[in-house]
Amino acid sequence: MQNSNKILQALGIPYTALLSVIFGLLLVSFPIGIFVVFESDVGGDINFDYPLTHLELFHGTELYLMPTDISIGDAFVVLWTFYAILFTISAIGPKHGFFKSLSSVISFGKSEYQSNYMVGITKWLSILILISVLINFIQEGFGIETIPPLDDNDLIQFFYVSLAPLIEEFGFRLLLIGIPLFALYSSKSSPKYFLRCLWRPANLDIFDSKKAILLIVFVGVLFGFAHIAFGDSWSEGKFAQASAGGIILGWVYLRYGFVASLLVHWATNYFVFSYATFISQINF
């Protein structure tokens, strides 16, 4: 038992180092995102003053092309602030800070995954990225390409990838997983308890996880299909990648709650795009 604990402690050193590096990169991505939107020329002939209602997002509604003082930069700052607040909350709680939680892995060879949200976020973000890369590598070997939807402007695309996690996590995790889980496993019916379980399904007494796992897999596949189902969507190669990502996000939601799944999703979008755009601007 003692030898086993020493092995876990030894493995804990590279493990905590990896999570610490990812945490640092996520932290730095916040100012990088601000630079990309407000200081770079990624938008070409438009910039952060572009009216929000001119986005194709509002096409077909009464808001489309309506005169407004709200710009894409204003909306981005609201999203940025929202994610920054959640990031801070995740780094300091719910019980211990990020680095204090990691220190227990090195000191005692064990990790209490519920002590800090950021530990779970960085761990599952690593897993999600690794699986996505593997799927992409395998599919390319069979000639299956993963082509993103075409957008004429990178600034608008950056705004969309920042907004998408909030919309998709609300729809696919809160509504399609959270509510059915409550219906399956809840022993109470109070509104307060419902909201607590929706926010963090671990509050439910999930005595038989088979139904929960099947639900997560089903919604994950649905999530993958949603990425290729429309005319301006990703190519078919995105289906497997998005389905795997949807299943992982569903598991993160079940185990850690909505904040964790939202931030993992945000990181895969905002984090990757901000660094890629920043590097391209430097090279340019």
Regions found by a protein language model. Name each.
Residues 1-118, 273-284:
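N-terminal, membrane-interfacial amphipathic/helix-forming hydrophobic leader that caps
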